From Swiss-Prot:
Organism: Salmonella arizonae (strain ATCC BAA-731 / CDC346-86 / RSK2980)
PANTHER family: IMIDAZOLE GLYCEROL PHOSPHATE SYNTHASE HISHF, IMIDAZOLE GLYCEROL PHOSPHATE SYNTHASE SUBUNIT HISF/H IGP SYNTHASE SUBUNIT HISF/H
Major enzyme class: lyase
Name the UniProt record assigns to this protein: Imidazole glycerol phosphate synthase subunit HisF
CDD domains: HisF
Pathway: Amino-acid biosynthesis; L-histidine biosynthesis; L-histidine from 5-phospho-alpha-D-ribose 1-diphosphate: step 5/9
Subunit and partners: Heterodimer of HisH and HisF.
Keyword entries, A-Z: Amino-acid biosynthesis, Cytoplasm, Histidine biosynthesis, Lyase
GO MF entries: imidazoleglycerol-phosphate synthase activity; lyase activity
Residues the record marks as active site: 11, 130
Keyword set includes Lyase: yes
Length: 258
C-alpha cells in the first residue's frame, strides 16, 4: 500500500501566499519561499502552489519564485496557474517543479490534458477541479476562474462527469477542491469524496475543509483518498504536520514519518 500524503497548499497572488474562505476575501499569509521551506522541514510529503489569478488574468504563473522554491526544498512540488500550452508547462518544469496542474485552461480546452500527458507523461499531469454543491439542485457543479471572485463562473460540467472526462484524456492525478468547505474547517465533504472515489481510478487528493486531525483521518479512512491537501490549518499553525502524521500513524494510516 502506498503511503498517504499530507500536502500543504499555498495560494499565490502578487508574489505572496494568501488564503480565503470559499475562494473569497483573501488575506495575506506571508512570503512564498520561507513558508515552503517551513512545510518541507515539518515533514510535508509534497507542496502545491496555485497562482490563483493567472488563468483569470490571462497569464501564466510567475516563474521567478518557482526556481527559488526548488532551491530550498527537497520534496516534490506541483505548480498551477494559467498553463495553456506545452511550452508553458515545459518552462515551469524546467525551473524545478515536479508536476504541473491545470484547471480552468483544461475546461476551456480539454485536449490540453492529453497533449500535456503525451509530452511529459501522466505522472506529472494533475487536474484540479473546483466543485460546488448546489443546494437547489442537489448536484455538484464544476466552476471556472475561481481565483477571481468577480470572474468565477459555473460551467456546464457536473463534477462526476468531468472527473471521468479528465481521466480519459490523460490526467494522472485529480485534486478535488470542494469550494463549499474551503477555509471553514468543518471537515472534508466525505459524501462527495466517496462519490468521486467510486469513479476515480487515478490518485485522488481531497482539498477543502480540514480543521482537525480527525478530519484528515476521516478522508483517508472513510473516503480512501490518496492525499489530503490543506492550507489554513497549516498557515495559522493550528495543526503541526509532524504531530498530524504521528496521530495518523497511531490510527493505523500508512504514512511517511520523518
Amino acid at each position: 500500500m502506498l503511503a498517504k500524503r499530507i500536502i500543504p497548499c499555498l495560494d499565490v497572488r502578487d508574489g505572496q501566499v494568501v488564503k480565503g474562505v470559499q475562494f473569497r476575501n483573501h488575506e495575506i499569509i506571508g512570503d512564498i519561499v520561507p513558508l515552503a521551506k517551513r512545510y518541507a522541514d515539518e515533514g510535508a510529503d509534497e507542496l502545491v502552489f496555485y497562482d490563483i489569478t493567472a488563468s483569470s488574468d490571462g497569464r501564466v504563473v510567475d516563474k521567478s519564485w518557482v526556481s527559488r522554491v526548488a532551491e530550498v526544498i527537497d520534496i516534490p512540488f506541483c505548480v498551477a496557474g494559467g498553463i495553456r500550452s506545452i511550452d508553458d508547462a515545459a518552462k515551469i518544469l524546467s525551473f524545478g517543479a515536479d508536476k504541473i496542474s491545470v484547471n480552468s485552461p483544461a475546461l476551456s480546452d480539454p485536449t490540453l490534458i492529453t497533449r500535456l500527458a503525451d509530452r511529459f507523461g501522466v505522472q506529472c499531469i494533475v487536474v484540479g477541479i473546483d466543485t460546488w454543491f448546489d443546494d437547489a439542485t442537489g448536484k455538484y457543479h464544476v466552476n471556472q476562474y475561481t481565483g477571481d471572485e468577480n470572474r468565477t463562473r459555473v460551467t456546464q460540467w457536473e463534477t462526476l462527469d468531468w472527473v471521468q472526462e479528465v481521466q480519459q484524456r490523460g490526467a494522472g492525478e485529480i485534486v478535488l477542491n470542494m469550494m463549499n468547505q474551503d477555509g471553514v474547517r468543518n471537515g472534508y465533504d466525505l459524501t462527495q469524496l466517496k462519490k468521486v472515489r467510486d469513479v476515480c481510478r487515478v490518485p485522488l487528493i481531497a482539498s477543502g475543509g480540514a480543521g482537525t486531525m480527525e478530519h484528515f483521518l476521516e478522508a483517508f479512512r472513510d473516503a480512501d483518498v490518496d492525499g489530503a491537501l490543506a492550507a489554513s490549518v497549516f498557515h495559522k499553525q493550528i495543526i503541526n504536520i509532524g504531530e498530524l502524521k504521528a496521530y495518523l500513524a497511531g490510527q493505523g494510516v500508512e504514512i511517511r514519518i520523518c
